[in-house]
Regions:
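Hydrophobic, aromatic-enriched alpha-helical segments typical of multi-pass transmembrane helices
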Residues: 1-228
């Protein structure tokens, strides 16, 4: 297969679709953040998938940004960098949850409990130092990145505009999470997951359209112009 910008954009669209569906779907099967669950197979599978979601999401938003880099301007760049940093944070956090927490749960359950408290929204007690600021940092870049990138998409008029609005609104809605239990608040991810998948589909469709032979151009192997 020949590697072209069109093919890469299409692949980024598929990556974003997959990442969005994973982000939303994981919320329904995520085990409760308790030490007893950390060594189970369900915990491992969910966090392997979350690492994959982070990698695919990073590839997806990169393709989205490059598709509309001129139209989104500085606002789009800011949103892309913030969301990219969010996905990198997700990858790092999920790696810890998948590969570091299970041994800790057996050998040092009190430390595993403290780490789960950070990721689960429990109040920090200072025992883990700077690590306790991860949840606040992740919230900030998620909120600001989703808002700015979503608005930039809407203004650019290149990809699905209402998907951009859904991304912005879903990201901003996380400000209400302190009002709900963590098990309920995690479903605030659904609008963002849908928006990312929607934008990925929009990117994929637009890539297929622009990648098609233009009207009246010669198609390789046919020897003459073919009207589209």
């Amino acid at each position: 297969m020949t590697i072209t910008p069109s093919n890469l954009s299409g692949a980024a669209g598929v990556a974003a679709i997959t990442a969005g569906l994973l982000y939303g779907g994981i919320q329904f099967v995520h085990p409760v953040e308790e030490v007893a669950n950390v060594t189970g197979s369900a915990w491992a599978i969910v966090h392997y998938l979350t690492v994959a979601m982070g990698v695919l999401g990073l590839a997806g938003i990169t393709g989205m940004y490059l598709k509309q880099v001129q139209e989104t301007g500085l606002l789009g760049l800011s949103g892309f960098l913030l969301l990219g940093l969010f996905y990198l944070t997700v990858i790092a956090n999920s790696f810890v949850e998948a590969f570091v927490l299970p041994p800790l749960a057996e050998q040092a359950p009190h430390i595993a409990t403290d780490i789960l408290g950070i990721f689960g929204g429990a109040a920090a007690d200072g025992s883990l130092g700077p690590l306790e600021g991860i949840s606040t940092f992740a919230f900030a870049i998620y909120f600001l990145g989703g808002l700015t990138f979503g608005v930039a998409v809407f203004r650019a008029r290149v990809l699905a505009r209402w998907a951009g609005i859904l991304l912005a609104a879903g990201s901003v809605s996380t400000a209400l999470l302190p009002l709900f239990p963590h098990a309920v608040g995690r479903f605030a991810a659904l609008p963002v997951g849908i928006a990312v998948a929607w934008l990925g589909y929009s990117l994929w469709v637009s890539t297929r359209k622009t990648g098609s032979p233009a009207a009246g151009t010669a198609v390789p192997g046919r020897g003459r112009a073919v009207a589209q």
